Amino acid sequence: MQKKTIYFICTGNSCRSQMAEGFGKLILGDKWNVYSAGIETHGVNPHAIKAMKEVGIDISHHTSDLINNDILIASDIVVTLCSDADANCPVLPKNVTKEHWGFDDPAGKDWSEFQRVRDEIKAAIETFAHRV
């Protein structure tokens, strides 16, 4: 069976989508190709790397990438993780499902915000895994 593709999109591919890609590969990796990107690139936030390391997931090798049109149109589902990405997501082909899972941006906030958003993203991906 061919793997499906899920593409996590946020504004800068710095925090939320990076954490989603990390959890996605862990939780969905047997059945899904998992990618992330941003409307812009802001570099991977060191606190996102630290937050994921705290739960045993290494995203230190990830890069902050712009949306890749080839991945976008080959995706089965595109998940926007913030209102900016939701509003500015490119038009998708009819065969690509789009979902919006809004999460607060932890950048520039207390460490506990990174942990909270990380845990919310994990829970959302676990819920998604049970429904697909």
Curated annotation (Swiss-Prot):
Highest taxon of source: Bacteria
EC number: 1.20.4.4
Enzyme category, top tier: oxidoreductase
SMART domains reported in the protein's UniProt record: LMWPc (SM00226)
Cystines in this chain: C10-C82, C82-C89
GO terms, biological process: response to arsenic-containing substance
Gene Ontology CC entries for this record: cytoplasm
Subcellular location as annotated: Cytoplasm
Catalytic machinery residues: C10, C82, C89
Pfam families in the cross-refs: LMWPc
Reaction(s) catalysed (UniProt annotation): arsenate + [thioredoxin]-dithiol + H(+) = arsenite + [thioredoxin]-disulfide + H2O
Record's keyword terms, sorted: Arsenical resistance, Cytoplasm, Disulfide bond, Oxidoreductase, Redox-active center
A molecular function GO annotation: arsenate reductase (thioredoxin) activity
Function: Catalyzes the reduction of arsenate [As(V)] to arsenite [As(III)].
Listed PANTHER family: ARSENATE REDUCTASE
Listed NCBIfam families: arsC_pI258_fam, PRK13530.1
Family: Belongs to the low molecular weight phosphotyrosine protein phosphatase family. Thioredoxin-coupled ArsC subfamily.
Record protein name field: Arsenate reductase 1
Annotated organism of origin: Staphylococcus epidermidis (strain ATCC 35984 / DSM 28319 / BCRC 17069 / CCUG 31568 / BM 3577 / RP62A)
Organism classification: Bacteria, Bacillati, Bacillota, Bacilli, Bacillales
